[in-house]
Amino acid sequence: MTIFNSISSISNSTRITSSSISTYNYNGSMANVNSTACFDNDFGGWGGLGGFNNGCGGCGGGSNVNVINFDIDIGRRHRRCC
């Protein structure tokens, strides 16, 4: 399964929270990315994973970072990025 490390700056005070993910384990491979993960306030799913100036909002566009779509269900209804 996907294991996330170094998730920081999570706050429930705002509707969308940005946090940086520096290292993650995806299907047994390690990678370091400079990306932004977007959570909604009930942590029901990922809003999207983008790199550099893509920000919170979706699947990437002009980035040179590969965008990985996550489908994570944390006890509530989940949604996918693209």
Swiss-Prot record:
Superkingdom in the source lineage: Eukaryota
InterPro entries: HssA/B-related
Similarity annotation: Belongs to the UPF0512 family.
Protein name according to UniProt: UPF0512 protein P
Organism: Dictyostelium discoideum
